[in-house]
Design a protein with these regions (language model features):
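N-terminal, intrinsically disordered low-complexity tails/presequences enriched in Lys/Ser/Pro
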Residues: 1-33
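Catalytic glycan-binding domains that act on GlcNAc-containing polysaccharides
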Residues: 20-169
């Protein structure tokens, strides 16, 4: 029995991927960039429909997570649980953006003009805050995630993120 031919490659996606791989500066090499972007692109498709937006988002996540010393897949799991990838999400307590950053942080660091619905800005804040809590918790991820969410002492949120992380690894 003959195996079916692979689906034809979408030329638009090929062009976008090539462009984003060439711009991906947080990867060790182009092969790693291409492999990771392709793998994550397929998983992110249900949340972000436009291929260019998906790849741009993934590059930003990889860059900010790597800069903060985090695994990009963990950051994707946090985003899935926090906002379902909605950059305009606002929680009942006022947290904003994909990583649901509390706006008081802007004034705390003297940057009240920062826009937390800007993906790069939100990722930068969120990744640094998450990394800080991981360090404070001596690497205990469940505790760090509970601190990040403001639910320290309860691990329901942490369990949700860990479950989501399984899907991104």
């Amino acid at each position: 029995m003959l195996s079916p031919l692979p689906q034809p490659v979408d030329s638009e996606l090929r062009t976008l991927l090539k462009s984003h791989v060439e711009q991906a500066d947080s990867f060790t090499d182009r092969f790693d960039a291409e492999a990771w972007l392709m793998l994550m692109d397929g998983r992110l498709k249900r949340y972000i429909k436009a291929p260019d937006q998906r790849l741009s988002f993934l590059r930003s996540v990889h860059r900010e997570a790597t800069a903060a010393g985090l695994k990009p897949e963990l950051v994707l799991a946090v985003i899935e649980v926090e906002s379902h990838f909605d950059r305009f999400a606002i929680s009942s307590v006022g947290a904003q953006g994909v990583m649901q950053v509390m706006p008081f942080w802007k004034s705390e660091i003297g940057r009240s003009e920062d826009n937390l619905t800007d993906i790069d800005t939100n990722l930068r804040y969120g990744c640094i805050i998450l990394k800080h809590y991981i360090d404070v918790a001596d690497g205990h991820l469940a505790e760090a995630l509970a601190r990040y969410n403001g639910s320290y002492g309860s691990y329901r949120y942490s369990a949700k993120v860990m479950e989501a992380w399984d899907n991104w690894r």
